Structures are given as structure tokens and as C-alpha cells.
Amino acid sequence: MPFHPSVYPLCTAMANEWREMRHQLENLAASLCTDAAFAERHVESLQLFDALAQQADESAVLLDRLSGGMHSNEALSLVRLDMMQQRLGAALGELY
């Protein structure tokens, strides 16, 4: 079942929001890492910024694929983060 045409530009806009979020996360992490002592004490927490940035990027790419008209199953199969793919796949499975 195709989406209503208004969904496609919304997906594109949401993808851009996710990219902006990634950019802001990366900037925040970089500013926190300027203090070497802080970065050393909080290295595991700072790694979470990278994980969140990757998740935001994958979300943006997924939304781009959907806005381009790719079928949701195909778009989901291209997600590179396994846990994210599994969670979204479970949600998609509930719809069919």
C-alpha cells in the first residue's frame, strides 16, 4: 500500500532533522572532549554520543529511502545497525 503523497516530503524533512541532530551531537561530543581529563574519566559515556550519531544517521538514510518510494521491507534490509534493524523489523512485522 503506497503512502499518501504528503508523506514523502515529510520523510525528507524528518531525515534532515535527524542529520541536524547528528551534527549537534557530534559538536557537543567534540566540545566535551576538549578537556582531556574529562574525556578520560567519561570515555564510555562519550562513546554513547557516537552510537547516537550513528543511529541518527541511519534513521535519516532510512527516511530518505522511504521518501524516494522504496518499499519499507527493502529500506529496512539496508539498515547497517543490526540492533536498530531488529527493533524496526519487529515493529514492521506487527503491521503485516
Regions found by a protein language model. Give the residues of each.
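Sequence/structural signature of long amphipathic alpha-helices
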Residues: 1-96
